[in-house]
A protein has these predicted regions:
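C-terminal recognition in membrane/secretory proteostasis and scaffolding
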Residues: 1-188
């Protein structure tokens, strides 16, 4: 979400009625929050779009980050009803609250003098990718010799998909010593 002034929100489709309601409830407020980006394949990807104007969460007007963060922090593992306006239409969506700690790297694997961990939410957001794959923090000897650069995301080894660090570990443990294998990755 990013803050946007009312003048820009009207161009995005905020109705006059909603603007009047927000201005009456929060006279000092100069705008609302807008969806800037949605992580591909996330739980919200099918419900929210960039440009959606956030109006309410669980029936309460939300105009700033702090109240939004408080509601979301208290909604981990629960559903929340989010009301947005898109192109002049009010839409209500039920979204599942996620714990950011669950999609933040908390372990790593050292392999062939390299360092690998799961792709973090922050990196996925920055790269506009699903939170899937393994991040190459340091390619080390094995991946460096294969010219796989630091900052790449490993998505597969051989015929196997790599969705997370557990997949990566399982696959590399099964590889015989000195065996070469195809690695699918993306780099930015």
């Amino acid at each position: 979400f990013v803050p946007k002034p009312f003048a820009e929100l009207r161009r995005l489709g905020l109705t006059r009625e909603t603007e009047a309601r927000v201005r009456a409830a929060y006279p000092q407020q100069t705008g609302l929050l807008v969806v800037e980006q949605v992580i591909p394949e996330s739980k919200a990807a099918s419900d929210l779009e960039p440009g959606d104007v956030l109006v309410e969460v669980d029936g309460k007007l939300i105009a700033e980050f702090v109240p939004l963060a408080a509601v979301l922090d208290n909604s981990v593992g629960k559903e929340v009803t989010v009301a947005v306006e898109r192109g002049g239409q009010r839409l209500e969506r039920r979204l599942q609250g996620d714990n950011l700690n669950d999609i933040t790297p908390d372990e790593y694997i050292e392999y062939g003098d390299g360092v690998f961990h799961k792709l973090s939410y922050q990196q996925a957001r920055h790269l506009y990718r699903p939170v899937s794959g393994v991040y190459v923090a340091n390619p080390g000897y094995v991946f460096g010799k294969a010219a796989i650069p630091r900052g790449s995301i490993v998505t597969g080894i051989g015929a196997e998909d790599v969705k997370d660090l557990d997949d990566f570990e399982r696959i590399i443990e099964m590889l015989p010593d000195q065996q070469q294998e195809t690695v699918r990755y993306v780099s930015f």
